[in-house]
Structure formats: C-alpha cells, structure tokens
Swiss-Prot record:
Reactions performed catalytically: beta-D-fructose 1,6-bisphosphate = D-glyceraldehyde 3-phosphate + dihydroxyacetone phosphate
One Pfam family it belongs to: F_bP_aldolase
Organism, as annotated: Helicobacter pylori (strain ATCC 700392 / 26695)
GO molecular function: fructose-bisphosphate aldolase activity; zinc ion binding
UniProt pathway: Carbohydrate degradation; glycolysis; D-glyceraldehyde 3-phosphate and glycerone phosphate from D-glucose: step 4/4
Protein name: Fructose-bisphosphate aldolase
Positions bound to Zn(2+) 2: 104, 134
Record has Zinc as a keyword: yes
Length: 307
C-alpha cells in the first residue's frame, strides 16, 4: 500500500534501523525491488529522479508503482522524488501521486535553501506528502547533479538544527563525506560519524544518506567479467553503512549498485550469445541480480522483517 514517506521513516527512526531507498527507471528495476521487499518482508522506499521521470513519463512512473502496490498490498511503500530541483518539480510530483518529495536546494546559500524548502514543505504538507531536504553539498555526478570536489561542503550541525526547526522538513540529508556515482573516495573511505551523531542529536528526525552505494565485490566482479570498466571506482564499505545507521541514518539511497548489477547481466548475455535478441533473455537475469543486491541491502540496514 502507498503511504507517506514519514510513516516508514519515523518507525525506522524510533526503532533504530535503516530503509534502503532504491531508484528505478523502468519496470524491470521496479519489479525486482518489489520482489525483494516481498521476500524480505521489508517496507519499501521507491524513488526516481527528474531525469528518470523525463525518460518514463510521470504518469507511467506513478502508474507502475500503484500497480505493484496492488500486487503486494501488504508492503508499505513510499514513492519519492529524488533530487527535485525546483518548487514546480516537487509540486508536479505531489499532484501526480508521489507520497514523498526531496527539494534539493543545497547548492544555494543557507537562507535561500531554507526559504525554498519551507515553501515546498508548506505545499506538500497541505497535500499530506512528506519532504526531504539536503544541507551541505555532496561531490559527484547523479543525473543532472554535478558537484566538483572544491565545492563539496560538509553539513554544519547547528545550521541543521536551525534548518529543521524553521522549515519543519520531515527528514534531512546531511553531507558527511559521501559522494554520488561510482567514484566516491580518492583515498581511504572516510565519513564524519561524529558530525552525523551531532546532527541527529540536535534535530531528532530521520536522517538520509546520499551517495550510499557500496559497489560490493561480487557486483564489481560480475561487471568486470562482462567486459565493463570500473577503474578507480570505490563505494561506501558495508561497515560504514551500518555505522551510519547506528549514528542516526534511516534512509539509505541506493542507485549506482542497482545499475551496475543490472547492466552486468545484460552485458553477460550479449557477450555469450551474440545472436540473442529476445529481451526477456537479457532482463530476466538482470532483474534477479538487482533483486539480490536489494535483498542484501535490506538485511544489512535492518529493514528486513519490519512489516
């Protein structure tokens, strides 16, 4: 059943576990995510970006999610707009049936971010929709979001406290050292867990970890074995994800891992049978690989068996 984002995350916040927020761009990805939720008895945070909405069409995206909710009525599901860049984009998502939206004004100055977030919160709350915002800036590239290393800034905990109090946002994504994409760290992975814990203490709301793909060894191997190139890639270690949840993270965004796992299987089929053109032969193993990544993440973060 489709529910407000806060309905899922407040429970995670109170009970101290994390919920994976999984991006989709087509039916195959969505189907695999729902199958994983069903098999692991986990609530689902389904999200899609402005770029993916442009690709699928917003009515199609919402329609597919609603259809899957009818197939699995026992699973609490939030449909979330990831990285909404404007008020209009968030409003469009709310009107289309999303139950959670993110307004990402983190590239603006604090006061501008606060003003725009507050405007979105008022609009969304009037419609019964939850809102996420971001403070600090994550390095990396995701859809139309691109931030250089010199522009990446970690969150200020006191500013986070003020921001949450004044905006009344439902959950916050604090920048603590992760980055978008497959190339998250130049040296050894490092996240500012002390900063995270202070933000949690001062805000006392669900927190979100962006740039949280791990690029697990088995997924990396499958991609490389199929002829892919991930030179220099480095994800967030599993133990860091677990430590983040202990420090107050309740929503863990995951996109890159899903893409890599899916495409690895498509490449594999293409390499092994160059005469193959039955799409089902490509997408069936790709869905299974993606589902396994999602199931593993649900168990790691603690959302398995939380329905």
């Amino acid at each position: 059943m489709l529910v407000k984002g806060n309905e899922i995350l407040l429970k995670a916040h109170k009970e101290g576990y994390g919920v994976g927020a999984f991006n989709f761009v087509n039916f195959e990805m969505l189907n695999a995510i729902f199958e994983a939720g069903n098999e692991e008895n986990s609530p689902l945070f389904i999200q899609t970006s402005e770029g993916a909405i442009k690709y699928m069409g917003i009515d199609m995206a919402v329609g597919m999610v609603k259809t899957m909710c009818e197939r699995y009525p026992h699973i609490p599901v939030a449909l979330h707009l990831d990285h909404g860049t404007t008020f209009e984009s968030c409003e469009k998502a709310v009107k289309a049936g999303f139950t959670s939206v993110m307004i990402d004004a983190s590239h603006h100055a604090f006061e501008e971010n606060l003003e725009l977030t507050s405007k979105v919160v008022k609009m969304a709350h009037n419609a019964g929709v939850s809102v996420e915002a971001e403070l600090g800036r994550l390095m990396g590239i995701e859809d139309n979001i691109s931030v250089d290393e010199k522009d990446a800034v970690l969150v200020n905990p006191k500013e986070a406290e003020q921001f949450v109090k004044e905006s009344q946002v439902d959950y916050l994504a604090p920048a603590i050292g992760t980055s978008h994409g497959a190339f998250k760290f130049k040296g050894e992975p490092k996240l500012d867990f002390e900063r995270l814990q202070e933000v949690k203490r001062l805000t006392n709301i669900p927190l979100v970890l962006h740039g949280a793909s791990a690029i697990p060894d088995n997924v990396r191997k499958s991609y490389l074995d199929a002829g892919g190139d991930l030179k220099g890639s480095k994800g967030v270690p599993f133990e860091f994800l677990q430590e983040s949840v202990k420090g107050g993270i309740n929503k863990v965004n995951t996109d890159t891992d899903l893409r890599i796992a899916f495409i690895a299987e498509v490449r594999k089929v293409a390499n092994e049978d160059k005469s193959q053109f039955d799409l089902r032969k490509f997408f069936s193993p790709a869905q299974l690989a993606l589902k396994n990544v999602v199931k593993e993440r649900m168990k790691l973060l603690g959302s398995a068996n939380k329905i």
